[in-house]
């Protein structure tokens, strides 16, 4: 915090991965008071953890507009030890953890701020981190499907490291377009493309599962965010596979940036990797 000059006392963080579960539940219509009383019992049927090991949150996304006496509820559950780990880092930095969100939802907040999406358009948000990729599929601004994949930018680094017998740091340098002694960036392009093919294959499997388990038959738009979004060749591989132009997420697309304080080139360089952070910054303490 001192290095970056962050002065805010309250911090929002996002969690994802195996310790986080998001489920859509279809329940009989009931009052908020009744739902508050029954949510723990309902949650036990959907999450693979002991109920006392998790923190729960939920939101009703449809109810009054349904004619079948049912309501849709989004349930988010995160293991307490995961939350404690993230919160502990904030506390160690002398700040207060005010909000713990789910990465997929923070990404959606940033999308709603920066992109206008028609109700009939199905959009896949893909956030590629170092070790985990978060996918949130939406119809308009309504979330339909979420999945975390245990793949990310480290797959590229590890492949380069293994193929060329390099250190992790040298492999990272090459992955990001640099060169190391005796090895040019051009020589690692085939490795990057091979990993991109594998990674995109996992994305497509997720899309096919979504289409097979929902009423939606197409993905109309794809926005790619995260620190790995701009890896050489990935955007083109994904574009070729899905048959339409994939977009790199711009977290500052609709945000006015003071160019006297922030270098526009730097802002552009970080615009895809800061999508989650921008989404978190929009959150209000509950």
Predicted regions and their residues:
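Phosphate-interacting basic helix/loop segments used at nucleotide- and nucleic-acid interfaces
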Residues: 1-5, 117-121, 202-210
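Thr-Gly-centered strand-to-loop micro-motif
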Residues: 23, 145-147, 225
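Adenine-nucleotide phosphate-binding core of ATP-dependent small-molecule kinases
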Residues: 173-221, 228
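Feature representing long, continuous alpha-helical segments
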Residues: 158, 194-197, 201, 205, ...
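Small-residue (GG/TT-enriched) beta-loop-alpha framework at ligand/catalytic clefts
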Residues: 7, 13, 68-173
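Glycine-rich phosphate-binding/hydrolytic loop that grips phosphoryl groups
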Residues: 109, 229, 247-286
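Glycine-rich phosphate-binding loops at beta-strand->alpha-helix junctions
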Residues: 195, 217-253
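Active-site neighborhood for divalent-cation/phosphate handling
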Residues: 14-114, 221, 251-257, 273-276
């Amino acid at each position: 915090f001192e290095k970056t000059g962050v002065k805010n006392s309250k911090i929002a963080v996002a969690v994802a991965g195996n310790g986080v579960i998001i489920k859509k539940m279809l329940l009989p219509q009931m009052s908020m008071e009744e739902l508050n009383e029954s949510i723990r019992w309902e949650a036990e049927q959907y999450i693979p953890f002991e109920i006392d090991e998790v923190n729960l949150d939920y939101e009703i996304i449809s109810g009054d507009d349904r004619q079948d006496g049912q309501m849709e509820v989004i349930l988010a559950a995160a293991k307490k030890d995961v939350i404690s780990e993230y919160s502990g880092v904030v506390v160690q930095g002398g700040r207060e953890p005010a909000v713990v969100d789910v990465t997929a939802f923070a990404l959606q907040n940033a999308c709603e701020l920066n992109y206008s999406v028609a109700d009939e358009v199905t959009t896949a948000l893909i956030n590629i981190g170092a070790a985990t990729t978060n996918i949130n599929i939406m119809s308009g601004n309504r979330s339909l499907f979420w999945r975390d994949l245990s793949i990310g930018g480290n797959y590229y680094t590890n492949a380069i490291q293994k193929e060329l017998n390099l250190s992790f740091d040298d492999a990272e340098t090459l992955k990001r377009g640099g060169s190391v002694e005796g090895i040019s960036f051009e020589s690692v392009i085939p490795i990057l493309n091979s990993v991109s093919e594998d990674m995109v294959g996992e994305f497509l499997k997720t899309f096919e599962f979504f289409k097979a388990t929902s009423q939606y038959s197409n993905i109309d738009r794809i926005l790619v965010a995260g620190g790995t979004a701009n890896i050489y060749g990935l955007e083109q591989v994904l574009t070729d596979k899905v048959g339409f132009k994939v977009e790199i997420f711009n977290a500052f697309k609709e945000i006015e940036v003071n160019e006297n304080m922030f270098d526009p080139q730097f802002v552009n360089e970080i615009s895809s990797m800061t999508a989650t952070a921008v989404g978190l910054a929009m959150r209000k303490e509950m």
